[in-house]
Amino acid sequence: MSEIALLFGKGLQVLGLFLSPILLVPLVSLAFPSLTQHFNKLKQSIDCLGKILMNIAGWSGFIMAAGMLIAVLMRYVFGLSFSWVKDIWIYAFATCFMFASAGALRTGGHVRVDIFYSKFSEKQRAIVDLIGAYLLLFPLMLLVLYAYGPQLARAWGALSGRMELSSQPDGLPLLFLFKTLVPIFAVTMILQGWANCMRAVAIIKNIPIEAAK
């Protein structure tokens, strides 16, 4: 399994190298607007991925609620408590949050201090979104990927040769997958942020760009 962990880590590094030049495409598109059309299909694919992640997040929310209900009934009605039941709703909650983040970014569903933004024109909003992505979103998500690397390596057993399965004897043996949600969250946020930037450039340059179906 340690070989799998190392391979997974190298895969993330390659992905990071691949994303670095791609992240510059929206900025280059400001000077060469025709690029927005060339990358339109990629943007649509990312938007579709955001929709899929939102659907997964919705089912995860249902599983979380059901898991919490089962845990309460087992504890206060039958006097039973199992770590794996608790793990179900904790893991489901984490999946719901991590997967829904990119989908919410696609639809503008994240909480923002909306004092001036709502009064801006569509083009002004696009400029704000573009600046915010490059000053805040991309640096923060890249920092998450970089800083979380050692923790992810330990979870997958790259250092000890054993994957982290559970902190409790009767817990779900999926702790390494649970911790993998963090880099998945960062990567999907970067991808969706990139798609939003391409959409913002199209708005700024008055270029019609087809939305994801």
What feature does the model see in each segment?
Residues 1-213:
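Alpha-helical transmembrane segments and membrane-interface helix-loop junctions
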